[in-house]
Amino acid sequence: MFGIGIQELLVVLVLVLLVFGANKLPEIGGGLGRAIRNFKRATSEPDEIDITPGKKNGKTDKDDKQA
């Protein structure tokens, strides 16, 4: 798994516990889970492209010709 062994994962876990403390870990895990879920949802949904003609950046085609 990405070249990381069990020993490295344990060291990272201990460092996270020391830095954030045991009380903050559920909040961090929940936030990370929500972020991953939202990322997966965003990548699986089709892109929404606005194809309506007309205004573009607050200007109309007529304004572009005059400039």
From Swiss-Prot:
Residues 46-67 are annotated as: Disordered. It is a single-pass membrane protein. InterPro entries: TatA/B/E, TatA/E. GO terms for molecular function: protein transmembrane transporter activity. Residues 58-67 have a biased composition (Basic and acidic residues). GO terms for cellular component: TAT protein transport complex. Keywords: Cell inner membrane, Cell membrane, Membrane, Protein transport, Translocation, Transmembrane, Transmembrane helix, Transport. Pfam families: TatA_B_E (PF02416). The chain crosses the membrane at residues 1-21. GO terms for biological process: protein transport by the Tat complex. Its main location: membrane. It is found in: Cell inner membrane. The keyword Acyltransferase does not apply. The Tat system comprises two distinct complexes: a TatABC complex, containing multiple copies of TatA, TatB and TatC subunits, and a separate TatA complex, containing only TatA subunits. Substrates initially bind to the TatABC complex, which probably triggers association of the separate TatA complex to form the active translocon. PANTHER family: SEC-INDEPENDENT PROTEIN TRANSLOCASE PROTEIN TATA. Belongs to the TatA/E family. HAMAP family: TatA_E. Part of the twin-arginine translocation (Tat) system that transports large folded proteins containing a characteristic twin-arginine motif in their signal peptide across membranes. TatA could form the protein-conducting channel of the Tat system. This is Sec-independent protein translocase protein TatA. It comes from Nitratidesulfovibrio vulgaris (strain DSM 19637 / Miyazaki F) (Desulfovibrio vulgaris).
